[in-house]
A protein has these predicted regions:
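Basic/aromatic-enriched alpha-helical hairpins
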Residues: 1-19, 36-38, 42, 191
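Basic, Lys/Arg- and aromatic-enriched nucleic-acid-binding interface segment
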Residues: 10-14, 18-23, 27-29, 42, ...
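Active-site/catalytic core of tyrosine-dependent DNA strand-transfer enzymes
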Residues: 70, 113, 121-127, 147-192
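Generic structural detector for well-ordered beta-strands
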Residues: 117, 143-145
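A Lys/Arg-rich helix-loop hairpin that forms a DNA/phosphate-binding surface
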Residues: 1-6, 50, 174-175
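Short, basic/aromatic-rich helical patch in the C-terminal catalytic core of site-specific tyrosine
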Residues: 33-37, 95, 101, 186-187
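Short, flexible, glycine-rich and Lys/Arg-enriched loop motifs at helix boundaries
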Residues: 120-139
Length: 192
């Protein structure tokens, strides 16, 4: 399994710096193979399961990096300087995923009730094209309450581009942001 973890990625141009597969993926492959070979043993197609001698890697827990409260103001100031404060403020107070954030339309905002309807997300399909889909799980389709300050920022943002259906159109193209662009912007803001 070491080779899979170091060199197992088929498409190394997908933006991952590591050409290998994660321990979670390798473990999933092991479990799938083990189950298939176990079935073959039960059906007497093979005499023993070749994966019995293999040790699947332990799943490595990745520590989430979070923004510390004392850095919040400087983060928001940097987002404001880049002209993207409403988007990143909403992300902070709502916990929306990047694909959900860029898929938001003005119709998703209920100003009176201070809620945002989350019912879609943009994701990259295997060929690299963006596609609109429902969120990961049915419980991910939801209404998110947001503070009045977020609503006020969103209204100000809408006044800048009232003809756009997108809540956060790109200042360059006028179209929606790509989810990866949001990540890159976030990284730039952290460096500012």
């Amino acid at each position: 399994y070491k080779n899979l973890m170091e060199h197992g990625r088929v498409n190394t141009k997908s933006g991952h710096g590591n050409p290998g597969l994660s321990s979670t993926t390798v473990r999933s492959v092991h479990l799938m193979l083990h189950s298939a070979f176990e079935r073959a043993v039960k059906e007497r197609l093979i005499s023993r399961n070749p994966t019995d001698d293999c040790i699947a890697p332990k799943v490595q827990k990745v520590e989430m990096k979070t923004l510390r409260p004392e850095h919040l103001k400087s983060y928001l100031d940097a987002a404001d300087a880049r002209g993207v404060l409403p988007m990143f403020y909403l992300e902070l107070v709502s916990g929306l995923r990047k694909g959900e954030l860029v898929a938001l339309l003005w119709d998703d905002l209920d100003i009176q009730n201070r809620t945002i309807s989350v019912s879609k997300q943009y994701i990259k399909n295997p060929s690299g094209k963006l596609t609109l889909s429902r969120p990961k799980t049915e419980t991910s389709v939801r209404k998110v309450s947001v503070p009045q300050e977020a609503v006020d920022l969103l209204i100000q943002e809408h006044e800048k581009h009232p003809d756009s259906p997108y809540m956060f159109p790109s200042s360059t193209t006028g179209e929606m942001y790509y989810p990866d662009s949001v990540v890159k912007l976030h990284e730039k803001i952290l460096r500012d």
